[in-house]
Amino acid sequence: MEASAGLVAGSYRRNELVRIRHESDGGTKPLKNMNGQICQICGDDVGLAETGDVFVACNECAFPVCRPCYEYERKDGTQCCPQCKTRFRRHRGSPRVEGDEDEDDVDDIENEFNYAQGANKARHQRHGEEFSSSSRHESQPIPLLTHGHTVSGEIRTPDTQSVRTTSGPLGPSDRNAISSPYIDPRQPVPVRIVDPSKDLNSYGLGNVDWKERVEGWKLKQEKNMLQMTGKYHEGKGGEIEGTGSNGEELQMADDTRLPMSRVVPIPSSRLTPYRVVIILRLIILCFFLQYRTTHPVKNAYPLWLTSVICEIWFAFSWLLDQFPKWYPINRETYLDRLAIRYDRDGEPSQLVPVDVFVSTVDPLKEPPLVTANTVLSILSVDYPVDKVACYVSDDGSAMLTFESLSETAEFAKKWVPFCKKFNIEPRAPEFYFAQKIDYLKDKIQPSFVKERRAMKREYEEFKVRINALVAKAQKIPEEGWTMQDGTPWPGNNTRDHPGMIQVFLGHSGGLDTDGNELPRLIYVSREKRPGFQHHKKAGAMNALIRVSAVLTNGAYLLNVDCDHYFNNSKAIKEAMCFMMDPAIGKKCCYVQFPQRFDGIDLHDRYANRNIVFFDINMKGLDGIQGPVYVGTGCCFNRQALYGYDPVLTEEDLEPNIIVKSCCGSRKKGKSSKKYNYEKRRGINRSDSNAPLFNMEDIDEGFEGYDDERSILMSQRSVEKRFGQSPVFIAATFMEQGGIPPTTNPATLLKEAIHVISCGYEDKTEWGKEIGWIYGSVTEDILTGFKMHARGWISIYCNPPRPAFKGSAPINLSDRLNQVLRWALGSIEILLSRHCPIWYGYHGRLRLLERIAYINTIVYPITSIPLIAYCILPAFCLITDRFIIPEISNYASIWFILLFISIAVTGILELRWSGVSIEDWWRNEQFWVIGGTSAHLFAVFQGLLKVLAGIDTNFTVTSKATDEDGDFAELYIFKWTALLIPPTTVLLVNLIGIVAGVSYAVNSGYQSWGPLFGKLFFALWVIAHLYPFLKGLLGRQNRTPTIVIVWSVLLASIFSLLWVRINPFVDANPNANNFNGKGGVF
């Protein structure tokens, strides 16, 4: 689809397709005048025939083709004219090929069987073709979907190498065979479809295509020379020294065999003591719990029982959290090796195409300027422009988002060349110009200061235009929005509108100021109709998967939130170091990057950075089966999202040692399991040099398959799995990306609108086994879990320069609402069929990975014992009772050892992870704040939603900034019921401290000893809630009065009732009220 095609809107169900042009759209562009003297395949001169006239390859239409291209097409191509599809006739001097008719006027015995020159030339071409197309995927060639045609038209194949055949002298087929298997004799001879009215260079076919084959042949010859040199070094020939150019090439050949990444284990000097302390802590914890359960407090039995139940649950929760961190690792990548292998200077890039997804809903809560910065950082990434496509999903169908993207596309034509010329970081202009650093460091170009000043002025003008659009959007017209040409905006009704697609940049979408092409930028708003379930973000992401497969079909997908910009322009290459690695790429479902944030206060009061999770938990999971998917900053293997199983080796099929020890050996069933995986992945592991099917076969029942493949490839089963879109189904089998070569460009618009229609997913496996999985507001956990259950692994990539940065809700109310959403999703999964406690035991999910997922979904339940344990100190102080009886010196040892083991475990964890003690303490504090508020609400809301069907809506976290100060929003306390429970806990403990001290003062000196243990217990709770208390007292004029009123009222009523109705009052006045001293854990 051309970038100048305008906005395309339509509905498949209503059989509507409308094209809306902008005022800036011009008329029909004049076609390039072809004078017939230039070959339209390679770009060279056509040359002369033996008679001295201009060489004419096709006698029917005289389409300009030079003699070398004519010979190549006859020998190894389609043997047909690209324009009229007529079979080339043999000219005098050309060798005879199969199918030539006897023609008296051109037969010459001298050249009829002279294959030497022509075959040698064709062989050289095939050498280059085979090398260029299979150098990246030597272990598994690329499957051809049809007959290997190269198509022209509106959508160009992002990876032209991904659809070429590999037949030839060094390929898998016969020396003289034509690479077109599975040809139906009833069908016409396959041809290369070319539009004669357009310049072939615009389709990536002509000059570049021919030169790539020639350069590939040269590289193949150099590779053969290196192999011969290696034989001499092995003693099979004379002494040849690797000096000069040969030595450099030999070194390069060695570099191509080196891994592009490696695992960096944590030093044993740090990890071994950590593991020893964990085991000791487990032993101590067992003795501690044994003592607590066997020594009740008789005169405070309810308090003791409550505390013991809480402590047992805390111990269980600690085990779930601790053991997945048993084998943490680090990783490092080698971008130079990636460049040597796939992206050499002066050669066509062999990097695979990548589609980047950006999701947004409400432009008033997710400011268009933030989204624009994210898009600009994507368009200027350090990656081949023809291999990157950016898709922006507007799930709110807002015209403001559409207009801001239009402005962003125009500004990108200036911003992208500036970034690449001066190699600046980050490439989001808002954050680049806001940096308080020496921006002249490492800059040597004299024009940098002048151009930077001009670019900053351009960006400020761009911001003014965006702000004007935002101001205009504040007041919605009664008749709805209209576009520049007066056409009503199709998305005026956000709940009832057609699907919309607009290509802003890309092929034929305009060049940047330096005359270079830009990555494709595509706006997508899926169709929405009343009565259809849209599944929120998960549904929008699945729509992007389908529409991207139809238009560009990148082999890998990278999704980011609209507020997460590329902080590292090489982030995609960092992911490709794993995805394109021959050893692990075929079994890696995604590469997860950590989340890093801007705009957070120095002390990170509410633990927005999540440092402990990303630098400790995620590294621990990376050593097992990989990190969990966190919803953004993740690069996916498209095949994994399609529900396929990974390509497993013998080693992968061996049971995990922990599973083997816990569940017994599975060697008996290994062969059958392997066969099952071979069978299920057969479509991707078969001979990829043979086309999988003709496009016509999709509508004819997929005829012509062998028995094994027909199990998966029947028309009914494929449509039930992927939906009824032949173009999309064809794209799903292009394992290395790219558009199927026989796809008709004229059908792409219709298919793109079709696959984002509201009813496309009906009676398919979308959201169940394919794509983002439905069933929870935290679709990221379910999606990653399903992939891991199939046997895929994931990778945690933490480069020195953070790959992505985003904005976090520094306001406590918004932060708690965000945590509430995450916890609510966990409860939904816990009560669903996808619960990791019982789901996926027949898959390849490893035991520790399963434990990590169980911990991910059960952690909100910890809020119930946590809030009970936080109120216990107040009960003890008010009633003058305690949860621990008088203990002996022997029993006190277990209390002391437990506290020491907890402290040492934390210290050693910080030692190997590099996390600061302040970050660790902030994480502990917010664990209590979130546990006594958001997690508690999530448990009850989740039960209501799943069991009673009462849905609770969540709001998008606001990314807008406050202009009153850098962290002015930090002190805002918006009204939310989530603030009541922690405020009540604070007040109850403060009242308990006052009551306990008053009782000690009135009772004399002997009561101060037991008081210290209770005060320590209460102060420990208050210390964890200190950030919350500081926020309440920070700016009292901004604290909601209703929060204070409700909290004080609940705390006072509860305290007074407890004093009035004391369940621990003994009827015997001579009873001993002394409860002794002790710990509080």
From Swiss-Prot:
Report which reactions are catalysed by this protein.
[(1->4)-beta-D-glucosyl](n) + UDP-alpha-D-glucose = [(1->4)-beta-D-glucosyl](n+1) + UDP + H(+)
Query: Where Zn(2+) 2 is bound, by residue?
Result: 58, 61, 81, 84
Chain positions of all zinc fingers (RING-type):
39-85
EC supergroup of this enzyme: transferase
One GO CC term, this protein: endosome
Q: From the UniProt record, give the pathway where this protein acts.
A: Glycan metabolism; plant cellulose biosynthesis
In this chain, Mn(2+) is annotated as bound at 537, 561
GO biological process entries? cell wall organization; cellulose biosynthetic process; hyperosmotic salinity response; plant-type primary cell wall biogenesis
| Functional description taken from the UniProt entry | Catalytic subunit of cellulose synthase terminal complexes ('rosettes'), required for beta-1,4-glucan microfibril crystallization, a major mechanism of the cell wall formation. Involved in the primary cell wall formation. Required during embryogenesis for cell elongation, orientation of cell expansion and complex cell wall formations, such as interdigitated pattern of epidermal pavement cells, stomatal guard cells and trichomes. Plays a role in lateral roots formation, but seems not necessary for the development of tip-growing cells such as root hairs.
State what protein this is by name.
Cellulose synthase A catalytic subunit 1 [UDP-forming]
Q: Which gene encodes it?
A: CESA1
